[in-house]
């Protein structure tokens, strides 16, 4: 068979007014030419050129009002598909003829025509996407139609979409609309098998966004009882409305309805929520106001972009999170660089993390900006399938330059079982820190990741940070329990930090319990410390100033060839230049078991340098600088003398230490049972 050319229709829509109403879709008129080699097909748009049907969405019958009609325009195009081949047909200027070459003309099977030609074609599937709707009016290129032809000479088009013309109420006239988001409970992908081996996939996009109130909205066909959720942001507030269909939405029909918007106070976030830009300009004087769950979703979409560095955000309401959470700023190369002021508000609920984000899990993944004055009461769980899995309630990874200031947590942090050879860092506030963490309080239990039976696995858990790699953690308090977990190589749990590298820990206290892991998958080395679980290695240079442990520390179990290290201040230290200044342990210590060597004293196992330290009891690991104290009794001359001697030692230390290493604390008796640090 010779190649056949078709002259067919396709059209760009033009808006017109008419009083007619016709629900028929298309009536083509076919006139083959004399040769039989080509055909001229004349086709009419829905209703023989008359408007789409108009039906009021909330009413019972057909409304009497102008409707939308369509006509063809020069240059219009559509595609024809057959047997995984497709060709484009174009309308000739000044005529009703459309030219193109039929795909696979000598093959068998029906032809599928899809308007407009921009529809994505994948094999026999034509994909329809309504997400590019604009608010300015009707976008004719989204009036999707299809036609089926057995012989390639006659194409009778049918509509794939319906049209909604909404009328919005409830927004004060003095307010300016900045964004509109519409979501539907219809699936984002809904296939329609229009004929054998030819499928239309209506990928409408679950969420559709506009920059102003839309005049028209294209809709997928929907059944009775389906919901359309409208979220509108203005320069002053956020409004919402939910529309439930009282009749089925049919393709090829125009619907009208009134959308009665009300101020939105939704504070509960869940997966699939639409994103709405908040009120504000992102400046220090006029920050973006995170006032509801829609604004929180919006922050996830912009928080990691470099163009938003230095922007200001302020939370103005308590919010709730539930379900799987994609953190804010998930790229290590594009961390959050703004200033987020929690404004002493609380985010509560629960967060679960998929393996896509377990390199850094938290409200924020990667932070290089400032997060302050935020209260977290969120239980978080995650499986660290990534090596170096990092998880904390506020941030998974606080990078260099990042600051987390005056934040609190009351939620639990729990790692899930992982069979891989990985390293995990879990903290009540931050998983992995290279920046500044200051004035934070953790009141939620932290339990390390169960790393399973694979060689090389490490598990670290800390009340404030999982791994304090560098930077400074200061003025922080942990009152909750910290529990180590199983890992073949090493497990470490610390009241403030699970592990410390070349970093500074300043003015921190711990009141909760620290418990080393016992059970299956006992590690070779198991460390538990009231303040720090373990120092990284012999290259670490760390400084610990004015830190006190008041809580019980219980050693765990190790393999028979390994060791357990239990310390009131630190479980194990191997740093080449470590200094503990004005630190103390007042907590009860319980030695670990099963190891070849089990260490248990105020400073666990390792090499230490200490100045003006005290312990409650007889156990200590330093040859000098340690003072054994009893509880505060005015008649105890030995304890009073010890306080004076320790303060003298601090004064001597300050006269020789580098400026950055000077200690700002002195010991004094208070009404408490034990001596306190002044200035802490």
Where are these regions (language model features)?
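Alpha-helical interaction segments
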Residues: 10-11, 148, 655-659
